[in-house]
């Protein structure tokens, strides 16, 4: 339920951080 959604959101957040680091 909500916990799984939280985990997915965390994964997306981590991916965005990685992409931002890579772009800079």
UniProtKB/Swiss-Prot annotation:
Keywords: Amphibian defense peptide, Antibiotic, Antimicrobial, Cytolysis, Fungicide, Hemolysis, Immunity, Innate immunity, Secreted. One of its GO terms (biological process) is defense response to bacterium. Disulfide bonds: none annotated. The keyword Transport does not apply. Transmembrane segments: none annotated. The keyword Cell inner membrane does not apply. It is found in: Secreted. InterPro entries: Antimicrobial_19 (IPR013156). It holds the Pfam family Antimicrobial19. One of its GO terms (cellular component) is extracellular region. Expressed by the skin glands. Antimicrobial peptide with activity against fungus (C.albicans) and Gram-positive and Gram-negative bacteria (S.aureus and E.coli). Also has low hemolytic activity against human erythrocytes. Belongs to the frog skin active peptide (FSAP) family. Pseudin subfamily. This is Pseudin-2. It comes from Pseudis paradoxa (Paradoxical frog).
